[in-house]
A protein has these predicted regions:
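Gly/Pro-rich hinge or "lid" segments in bacterial periplasmic/extracellular proteins
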Residues: 1-41, 167-168, 172, 335
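Ligand-site clamp/hinge motif
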Residues: 5-8, 35-82, 202, 211
Length: 335
């Protein structure tokens, strides 16, 4: 009855570090666990301090440039080159991390459900050149994707032809759906690459004659309703298998199915794919799933991210991980 599972109030553990000071939105500390000898290798530091600078990359770089920090969680955009220029070491990871611009098919806007119409969803995708979003949104630090959220690094990925880019056809399809004059609202978080990607998408929609306005929200607001917005951009971390991504994000009724996509054929094929252990055998079914994703205009998924982390000379074990993990037992400082 006296057990308290909060690690801040009752820091008991078998690892090399325990939580120390903690202030939400400001900082957190890990301190060496003196209660036992760490049986693994490493864990050479007395204390590790995490500092929260928010989404402002300029503030993060200022901390780097002033020597306030020894490494960053992630280096983004122009700040990759800036940290290169000051001589910090750079580590890269090729990933299946991405951003998805998705329409919520069940969302109501002024009493209607504009994105329930597949023509509207496909028109949005046809108006956007994914290569432009990679260039303007993420400084070309990655590879162009194909609007189905299965990556070439997933073992069961099926090769697909390039995404169709046809702004004139997009405008015609939007008009056919009776939505030529409808103003879309594209919502994103206020950080650099997700904001920039959404800005570039909105610009291309306007160039195609599709009205759109942008709404940019701070993180504390955006994540409250991220799965409910009618049209928004969300970043997704990689999963080891493509079937994991599709099951988590696109199967009917799943909590994280932010597109509200519900398709019986897709669900049946996904169940079949999940039952096939061999990736090469599973690929045939995955090809059908990927094609449904594109035919139904479920997401605009423009690129796969290469991700970077910088650290100052003498920091050890700080290399970037495909899912952003920091293995604190490996962190250390050169003698």
């Amino acid at each position: 009855s006296s057990f308290n599972g909060d690690p801040l109030d009752n820091p008991i553990g078998t690892g090399p570090y325990l939580p120390g000071a903690f202030e939400v939105g400001v900082m957190a500390e890990l301190v060496k666990n003196e209660g036992h000898a760490w049986w693994g290798e490493g864990a050479a530091l007395d204390k590790i301090t995490y500092m929260d600078f928010g989404t402002d990359q300029a503030a993060i770089f200022a901390a780097v440039d002033s020597g306030e920090v020894d490494m960053v969680y992630e280096s983004i955009g122009d700040f990759i080159l800036l940290m290169d220029d000051i001589g910090w070491s750079k580590s890269e990871a090729v990933t299946a991390n991405t951003v998805c611009i998705r329409a919520n098919q069940a969302a109501e806007v002024d009493g209607a459900t504009p994105y329930a119409d597949v023509r509207v969803r496909k028109a949005l995708a046809m108006a956007i050149d994914n290569a432009v979003l990679l260039e303007l949104g993420f400084n070309d630090n990655g590879s162009v994707a194909e609007n189905h959220h299965v990556s070439p690094i997933h073992p069961e990925y099926a090769e697909m032809p390039p995404v169709e880019y046809d702004p004139d056809g997009a405008a015609a399809l939007m008009a056919e759906a009776g939505m030529a004059d409808f103003e879309h609202e594209l919502i994103s978080i206020d950080d650099t690459w997700r904001k920039n990607t959404s800005d570039a998408a909105a610009a291309q929609l306007r160039d195609a004659g599709i009205p759109v306005r942008r709404t940019i929200l701070p993180g504390a607001t955006f994540w409250n309703d991220w799965a409910k917005y009618p049209l928004s951009a969300t970043d997704w971390a990689q999963r080891p298998l493509g079937v994991q991504v599709l099951a988590l994000a696109y199967r009917s009724g799943e909590p994280w199915n932010e597109s509200a996509f519900a398709n019986e054929e897709f669900d049946a094929l996904l169940s079949e794919a999940l039952s096939i252990a061999d990736a090469d055998t599973r690929r045939e079914t995955m090809a059908k799933l990927q094609q449904i994703m594109r035919d139904e205009g479920v997401v605009i998924q423009p690129y796969w991210r290469s991700i970077y982390r910088h650290y100052r000379e003498g920091v050890l074990g700080a290399e970037m991980h495909p899912t952003f993990e920091i293995h604190v037992s490996k962190l250390g400082l050169a003698a």
